[in-house]
Amino acid sequence: MPRRARKFKRAVAPDSRYNSLMLSNFINKLMMHGQKATAQRIVYDAIDIMGKQENKEGLAVFEQGLKNATPFIEVKPRRVGGATYQVPIEVRPDRAQTMAMRWIIKAARKRTGKSMAERLASEMLEASREQGAAVKKREETHKMAEANRAFAHYRW
């Protein structure tokens, strides 16, 4: 029996405009220093930009981009004897989504010039077309897992 009480996940309220839990989580990940209103403005502006550029609903482009950047498998280091092996493991759906969000935000922040909303929109558009830094990161992760497939039996 564990000594500590179990830590439960807090329920996140869906966002006000699109009533989407995924978008609410994305806004929370983008938020810095508790400035939620600023993060919301950036995300909503980015969705509007994506909608105009693609002539589709912005939220659909957002969801497609997030889906394309979501990894299925990752590697975790496991120490066996004196060696550390990179063991490929499947990613839980909630963690996979979190990783994709993190990668997209990081890639958007690395881009130069323009406003954050425009950078985020361009990164999301590229992700929806299976291009961009976030999708490249996912491909890298999958390649790493494939290369270390021999150590899959060390899974725990």
From Swiss-Prot:
Matches recorded under Gene3D superfamilies: Ribosomal protein S7 domain
GO CC annotation terms, alphabetical: small ribosomal subunit
GO MF annotation list: rRNA binding; structural constituent of ribosome; tRNA binding
Keyword tags: Ribonucleoprotein, Ribosomal protein, RNA-binding, rRNA-binding, tRNA-binding
Oligomeric and partner information: Part of the 30S ribosomal subunit. Contacts proteins S9 and S11.
Similarity section: Belongs to the universal ribosomal protein uS7 family.
HAMAP family from the UniProt entry: Ribosomal_uS7_B
Protein name: Small ribosomal subunit protein uS7
